Amino acid sequence: QTCALPICFQKNDFGHEKNLSLMLQKMLIEMQITPKNISFLHLNNGPARFTAIRNCHALMKGFFFGHKVKIFSYKIFEHYFLGINQSFQKNILCIIDTNRRDLAIQKLSPQGKLIGKIKTYLIDNQLIELLSGDYVLMGNGIEKLKKIKDYSFIKKKLMGPIELKSNYFINNVYQKKPQGKFPRIIYPYSPV
């Protein structure tokens, strides 16, 4: 058992959501933050692993219960787009590792607008054909492909980022209108 401030934490085998709520509680007490101190919130609403994102949304809803906050909601692909530090004239393919045998791919315009729907692709010739098109690439799925010899050509098409960072919200301005309510969570990608 470890004690920090007035809260005592016991070693536990809770899921990540319990540990996250304890860390959030400790941070709020140490930094003396209340909902009144926060005027807007940047929120990734998926798609992602549903349990993780659902738990994070539940914690945020509880924290802001009874308090108004402006919410800027981003899909995971838009979050990656915020990490771009140069402009391009080509459309972008954001490639997300689904932690299965496929990858989720979303097309974006050079301005970061989503084009069409998310599609999942097996790592095969159909994916090679798609990635050979006139696109620049970003997303964490690139790490999986870089290890495969048949995909060595993608190194020339990378424009980053290949990992998500929360400071992308600080570094870039993206044309989003704030909402007053928490958005619906986008369910995970459909498996192939």
Q: Positions of the model-derived regions?
A:
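N-terminal beta-alpha supersecondary unit
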Residues: 4-47
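Short amphipathic alpha-helical face segments that pack within enzyme cores
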Residues: 19-22, 58, 79
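Generic structural signal for hydrophobic residues
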Residues: 24, 59, 145-147
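Short glycine/serine- and small hydrophobic-enriched flexible loop segments
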Residues: 25-26, 65, 171-172
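DPxDG-like acidic metal-binding loop motif
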Residues: 40-76
